[in-house]
Amino acid sequence: MRIETNKAKWPLIYHGNGPAKENEIWKKTVKQWKNGADFKPNCTPEEEGITVITWSIPEETTMLQKSFEKMGMGKELIVIPITKPFNWLDKIKKTKEYLELIETKYILGLDATDVIVSSDIEGKPTIWYDVKGVFKNFNCKLVYNAEKMNWPSSDGHGTNIKEMDGLNGNLLRKLKETEEFEERIYKNLMDSDFYRFNSGGFMGYTDFTKEFYNTVWNKYVEPVYEKGFDEGFFGGDQGFLRIAQKEFFPDVTIDCNCKLFQTFAGINPDDIRGIYE
């Protein structure tokens, strides 16, 4: 199953982020995927030098796990366990820790509950080869998926931080700078509607991704880690990763043209040219 965008792109990974769950285009995509035939790629992610990770409660079977099972590759997905009560910042902490164990050249991180891996162009079995090829064409070291929604936003949506909140207020000031950066680079310069950072899908060179996550942890997350039980503190993990992108640009970028990742929150029929078996 594949989708084609209005820019004649064929993204490989689909993310029904946030409010996309009620989007009719996402619902149609999920239905097509569920009803579609199983397929077997010609190689594993590891054979292409890719480790694929996700984060979920061990007892649950998620959409991403089912996607891998349809490929006959359930064991190729590394599930980093997240336990209740949720500390949303564990996603950063545990990713940072697990990155130290990875020996492959590339790391692909995908949210568990709302991500589907496509069956590739015309059902050809080269999905992992193509994922790697698309990533390398970004000419960056780490790419995140991009979305239309601004979350968390400096006007208070998704965060309860106020600008006068001492050290925490610095996070909000950084967020305002990041919003302006995203608008300048991805909206105005790149002429994209998908100009906001989303943390639910990323791919990078493992060594550089280690550096990025260590910096985010040490500089932004560790001092406020205990506040992570409240997703509304700073948008879960997303706010922290998002504000770090500017200082790492252009090594860190977002997929504003949806070449690798397609997010679905806020999309409309004009964004998608077709959904195909």
Where are these regions (language model features)?
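Catalytic core and acceptor-binding pocket of nucleotide-sugar-dependent glycosyltransferases
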Residues: 1-26, 178-277
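Short, high-confidence coil segments that cap the C-terminus of an alpha-helix
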Residues: 9-11, 104, 139-141
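N-terminal anchoring/stem segment of glycosyltransferases
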Residues: 14-106, 207, 249
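Conserved beta-strand elements of beta-rich interaction domains across eukaryotes
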Residues: 18-21, 57, 85, 114-115, ...
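A generic structural motif
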Residues: 42, 76-85, 143-148, 227-235, ...
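A short acidic (Asp/Glu
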Residues: 62-65, 117-122, 127-129, 154-156, ...
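A conserved donor-nucleotide-binding helix/loop in the catalytic core
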Residues: 84-110, 114-120, 126, 197, ...
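Conserved donor-nucleotide/metal-binding helix-loop-beta segment in metal-dependent transferases, i.e.
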Residues: 115-177, 181, 188
